[in-house]
């Protein structure tokens, strides 16, 4: 019994006691004696009581009578010592130390807790003193909570130490209480001994009753042994009957048979159960199927006499084939009594009731053997009166199931029950509900409790599996026949019941139920099965639980199959938790499993999701909205999507694969291809939907992968007049913008180029103008534009990574196409021959023999950042994103390459005298001039001195300078008499030409006052036709050839040629300018600034010095 023992220093007051020998559980303590009484004198010896014992103590009150003390001590030694109870006692000091330690720990925790409470500073208004002059202090909720915690701690600890004080006062009398405990234990032990003795005597008396034997009759025994007879038994004098022969015996038996037959037919009331009988051998045999055969006979010829029992045989198994001995005698007595008292009906009732009871007992014994054998711990058997109750699946959670086998009365309410009799009946309680038991295999002839149980369990399993079958078949995947579902059910063998379920095209699942325990068994992937076993719910029925587990497992199998195969195609699994987005709200409620994938060829703000449910497997495209633009990487970096938000999500398919498609690596390769395609198409459809200014078809909800894994196409309406302002491109001057394209553009996906990491999307359209004239002009260098050979169709190729919209590029290219067609029409008007067309350039031939080639380059500038092309950003923008600029390039030996920049500046000016028409006219106008300059500047040996320099002010103004003679001329194209002519004027000052009178005279005679082929002098100048200006320049050059003045030195020419090569290369971006080996580019004072200001007049063009 637990208790508290005071320490040595606390018993009888502080400082008392000497060496104390503790005795616990009757054993003396081995602690050495330590003298603690030196300060109080050696004469004082303290007394310590431990469990009623006194050691080394002398009572001062007994010191007066020493003899009395000795007598009492002697008597006490003769009595046995009471056993001492000390279990559960512990020192009071330990209780105090633990209480103090606990108080210290609680105080430390309190201090830590109060340190975590942040007290808000008190406002200045609360610092005002009240009328009493006493400050209330800080009255913030945090400070008040701190004070309350301190008070609660102090009160709690105070209560604990008050309890310790009470315990300390009680423990000072612990010695007396310990004696009382020992005495109570002694009395209880004695009482139990007395009660045990009485019980033993009663049991002996009861057992001796069976040993009683009656006194033997020795007198009768002695007479029998000596005389062989008993005189007390009278002799009736009967003579023994005469022995019968075989013939007599047969006659008597036949007579008995007739008597029995007549009696049963006319006199006796035979119950319905005994209507099947046979008469033979002097007896009648009544047959009750599956129960017994009863042989009866007569003792007298009188029809009113009773029938007598002869024999009985049971017709069911297991049973005793023949009754012998005491049991047979018991049957004889009971049956004869029943026949005498109640006739055949009473006999049947007795035997029928006996057989029914016997059958129930047999089934009970079989059930007990099963419960002790293989069915251990899964069966519970009870026999209530004549009703056998067998509980099966006892360890299964939920509603219980059991089988009751008992005796039914056979009566039906409202019907005639004269022919009804009791019989064995079944009552089946399945999951707490009584159900019909007609289908249970119950053979009353061959009794087998195991067969009955197996039939009941088979029916129960069939019910569970059929219910699960119905639940699963309601889902769309199985009701539509896309996945197979088969059930095998039986009434007798539970092990043959099962479900075969197709999870995916390549995976199947079998469901069965263990007959003994009732646990459902699902044969699937081990890892998935382990996870599913933890998901079982006791609140669901077995069928619902199986259906739920099958649904989860099917979805897991579908997602696992997708994950394991698409990874081989370069897809990367994306953890949805890293995106900080609740995708459960995105998908329908019936989705059980989902997984996200990303491919390194895709844009980082697009992913695809595979979702699986019992109604179907779907692919989704998911668009993420990121705050930062991530660079392209081969690995999906979740850190760049921490702050991502969900922008859109759309289902794109009703299944992972085509229904008739064989699952394998080729099918997954096609799937990866078409996922990229649907992502590319869906990206552009989503872009058009967000743009809200361009109509398209089909809508996003219907933009799904077709059943044969074909990527759908988009049809968008394109009208040049309704193009959003941000996408509109202003055509250069001279180009006419008109409707040349029909209003419908078809976008189709044409694969992914893994080398370039782009998807190919082709835009198909039709022109409103015939294309026979330029259908064969497709460029061999740029395949982004193709025209149909027959018809009006065209195709534009667009390249972009899957996930990046091509709509801005399509808008640009369609307007480029309009620009190209406008250029083609302009060239046709100018009688120039177009050689090739593409979205980036137009190559054409011009000249009298169409032997000179020029290329018009169409260049467009657009934002490089994808954020600037976002529809949300474009909604607030009114300025166009695109700026178109035309460029012009000439190939060697085209003479116009010398004035390329001047012509380009004219091409892009917005003035009325600029544009493509003006450039075409300039090319035709300046062609004879440029060819003449080529002839004049021809220097095959590259060793002749530099004689002439040509400065191009613009395409219509040239300055010709002969530095050796200090003569300058200006050649200007102007209108004269409604047609263009070239006019040559001298610009040299009198100071420069003062020493060249002879040359001046020659010029006047041969040019100014002369006339030639296509030119004529004007006195102070020369006018020439545009086609004959070469003759004028040839004659001018002959005048200076006659001069003997030497030109520039070769060193000067070489340096000039070098500077021309460097400058022209910097301007044209190639080295074609170096073909004129004696040309020098010398910038005028305004040339550098003018080169960057295309809006200025052409008077400030570059200056080209040509030798």
Curated annotation (Swiss-Prot):
GO function term, MF aspect, one: transcription coregulator activity
The UniProt record lists the keyword Transcription: yes
Location of this chain's protein in the cell: Nucleus
Annotated spans, Disordered: 1-28, 1081-1107
The keyword Nucleus appears for this protein: yes
Any single GO BP term: regulation of transcription by RNA polymerase II
Primary location class: nucleus
Annotated keywords: Activator, Nucleus, Transcription, Transcription regulation
One GO term describing the cellular component: mediator complex
Pfam families per UniProt: Med14
InterPro entries per record: Med14_N, Mediator_Med14
Highest rank taxon of the organism: Eukaryota
Family note: Belongs to the Mediator complex subunit 14 family.
Job of this protein: Component of the Mediator complex, a coactivator involved in the regulated transcription of nearly all RNA polymerase II-dependent genes. Mediator functions as a bridge to convey information from gene-specific regulatory proteins to the basal RNA polymerase II transcription machinery. Mediator is recruited to promoters by direct interactions with regulatory proteins and serves as a scaffold for the assembly of a functional preinitiation complex with RNA polymerase II and the general transcription factors.
Subunit details: Component of the Mediator complex.
Name recorded for this polypeptide: Mediator of RNA polymerase II transcription subunit 14
The species this protein was found in: Aspergillus oryzae (strain ATCC 42149 / RIB 40)
Organism classification: Eukaryota, Fungi, Dikarya, Ascomycota, Pezizomycotina
Gene designation: rgr1
């Amino acid at each position: 019994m637990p208790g508290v023992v005071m320490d040595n220093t606390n018993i009888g007051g502080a400082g008392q006691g000497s060496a104390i020998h503790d005795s616990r559980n009757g054993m003396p303590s081995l602690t050495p004696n330590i003298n603690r009484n030196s300060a109080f004198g050696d004469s004082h010896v303290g007394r310590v009581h431990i469990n009623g014992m006194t050691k080394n103590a002398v009572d001062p009150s007994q010191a007066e009578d020493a003899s009395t003390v000795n007598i009492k001590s002697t008597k006490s030694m003769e009595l046995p010592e009471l056993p001492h109870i000390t279990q559960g006692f512990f020192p009071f000091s330990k209780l105090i130390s633990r209480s103090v330690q606990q108080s210290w720990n609680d105080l430390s925790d309190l201090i830590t807790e109060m340190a975590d409470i942040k007290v808000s500073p008190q406002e200045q208004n609360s610092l005002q003193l009240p009328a009493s002059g006493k400050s209330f202090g800080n009255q913030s909720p945090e400070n008040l909570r701190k004070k309350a915690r301190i008070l609660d701690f102090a009160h709690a600890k105070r209560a604990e130490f008050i309890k310790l004080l009470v315990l300390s006062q009680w423990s000072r009398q612990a010695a007396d209480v310990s004696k009382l405990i020992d005495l109570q234990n002694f009395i209880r032990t004695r009482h139990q001994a007395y009660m045990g003795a009485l019980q033993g005597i009663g049991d002996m008396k009861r057992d001796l009753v069976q040993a009683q034997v009656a006194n033997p009759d020795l007198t009768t025994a002695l007479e029998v042994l000596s005389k062989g007879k008993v005189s007390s038994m009278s002799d009736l004098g009967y003579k023994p009957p005469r022995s019968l022969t075989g013939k007599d015996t047969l006659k008597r038996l036949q007579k008995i048979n007739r008597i029995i037959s007549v009696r049963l037919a006319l006199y006796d009331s035979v119950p319905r159960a005994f209507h099947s009988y046979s008469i033979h051998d002097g007896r009648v045999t009544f047959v009750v199927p599956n129960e017994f055969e009863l042989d009866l006979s007569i003792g007298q010829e009188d029809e009113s006499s009773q029938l007598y029992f002869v024999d009985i045989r049971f017709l069911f198994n297991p049973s005793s084939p023949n009754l012998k001995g005491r049991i047979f005698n018991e049957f004889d007595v009971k049956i004869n009594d029943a026949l005498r008292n109640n006739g055949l009906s009473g006999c049947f009732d007795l035997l029928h009731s006996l057989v029914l009871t016997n059958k129930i007992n047999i089934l009970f014994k079989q059930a007990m053997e099963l419960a002790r054998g293989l069915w251990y711990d899964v069966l519970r058997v009870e026999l209530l009166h004549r009703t056998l109750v067998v509980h099966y699946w006892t360890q299964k959670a939920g509603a219980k199931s059991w089988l009751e086998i008992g005796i039914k009365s056979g009566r039906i309410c409202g019907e005639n029950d004269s022919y009804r009799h009791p019989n064995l009946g079944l009552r089946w309680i399945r999951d707490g509900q009584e159900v019909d038991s007609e289908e249970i295999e119950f053979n009353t002839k061959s009794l087998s409790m195991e067969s009955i149980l197996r039939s009941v369990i088979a029916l129960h399993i069939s019910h569970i599996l059929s219910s699960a079958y119905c639940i699963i078949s309601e889902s769309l995947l199985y009701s539509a026949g896309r996945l197979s579902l088969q059930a095998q059910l039986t009434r007798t063998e539970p092990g043959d019941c099962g479900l075969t379920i197709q999870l995916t095209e390549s995976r199947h699942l079998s469901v069965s139920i263990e007959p003994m325990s009732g646990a459902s068994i699902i044969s699937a992937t081990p890892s998935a099965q382990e996870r599913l076993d933890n998901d079982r719910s006791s609140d669901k029925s077995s069928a619902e639980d199986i259906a739920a587990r099958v649904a989860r497992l099917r979805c897991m199998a579908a997602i696992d199959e997708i994950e394991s195969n698409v990874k081989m195609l370069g897809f990367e699994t994306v953890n949805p938790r890293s995106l900080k987005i609740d995708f459960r709200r995105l998908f329908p409620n019936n989705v059980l499993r989902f997984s996200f994938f990303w491919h390194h060829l895709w844009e980082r703000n697009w992913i695809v999701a595979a979702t699986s449910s019992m109604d179907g497997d779907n692919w989704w495209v998911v668009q993420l909205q990121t705050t930062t633009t991530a660079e392209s990487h081969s690995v999906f970096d979740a850190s760049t999507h921490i702050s991502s938000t969900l922008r859109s999500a759309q289902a794109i398919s009703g299944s992972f694969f085509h229904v008739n498609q064989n699952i394998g690596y080729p099918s997954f390769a096609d799937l990866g291809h078409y996922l990229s395609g649907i992502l590319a198409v869906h990206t552009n459809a989503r872009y058009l939907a967000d743009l809200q200014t361009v109509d398209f078809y089909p809508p996003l909800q219907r933009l799904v992968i077709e059943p044969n894994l074909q990527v759908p196409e988009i049809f968008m309406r394109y009208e040049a007049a309704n193009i959003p302002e941000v996408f509109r491109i202003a055509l250069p001057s001279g180009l006419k913008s008109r409707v040349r394209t029909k209003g419908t553009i078809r976008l189709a996906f044409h694969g992914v180029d893994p080398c370039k990491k782009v998807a190919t999307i082709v835009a198909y359209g039709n022109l409103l103008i015939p294309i026979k004239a330029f259908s064969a002009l497709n460029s061999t260098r740029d395949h982004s534009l193709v025209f149909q050979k027959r018809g009006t169709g065209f195709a534009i190729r667009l390249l972009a990574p899957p996930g990046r919209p091509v709509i801005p590029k399509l808008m640009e290219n369609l307007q480029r196409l309009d620009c190209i067609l406008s250029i083609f029409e302009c060239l046709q008007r100018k009688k120039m021959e177009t050689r090739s067309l593409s979205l980036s350039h137009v190559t054409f031939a011009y000249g009298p023999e169409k032997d000179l080639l020029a290329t018009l380059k169409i260049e467009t500038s657009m934002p490089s950042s994808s954020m600037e092309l976002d529809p949300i950003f474009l909604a607030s923008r009114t300025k166009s994103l695109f700026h178109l600029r035309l460029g012009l390039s000439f190939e060697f030996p085209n003479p116009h390459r010398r004035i390329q920049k001047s012509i380009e500046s004219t091409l892009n000016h917005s003035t009325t005298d600029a544009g493509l028409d003006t450039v075409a006219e300039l090319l035709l106008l300046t062609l004879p001039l440029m060819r003449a300059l080529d002839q004049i500047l021809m220097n095959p040996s590259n060793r002749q001195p530099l004689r002439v320099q040509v400065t191009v002010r613009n395409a219509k103004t040239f300055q010709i300078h002969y530095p050796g003679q200090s003569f300058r001329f200006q050649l200007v194209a102007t209108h004269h008499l409604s047609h263009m002519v070239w006019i040559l004027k001298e610009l040299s000052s009198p100071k420069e030409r003062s020493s060249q009178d002879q040359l001046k005279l020659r010029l006047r005679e041969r040019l100014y006052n002369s006339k030639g082929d296509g030119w004529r002098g004007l006195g102070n100048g020369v006018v020439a036709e545009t086609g004959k200006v070469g003759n004028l320049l040839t004659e001018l050059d002959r005048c200076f050839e006659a001069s003997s003045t030497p030109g520039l030195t070769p060193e000067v020419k070489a340096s000039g040629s070098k500077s021309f090569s460097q400058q022209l290369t910097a301007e044209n971006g190639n080295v074609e300018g170096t073909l004129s080996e004696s040309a020098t580019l010398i910038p005028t004072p305004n040339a550098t600034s003018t080169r960057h200001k295309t809006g200025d007049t052409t008077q400030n063009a570059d200056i080209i010095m040509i030798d």
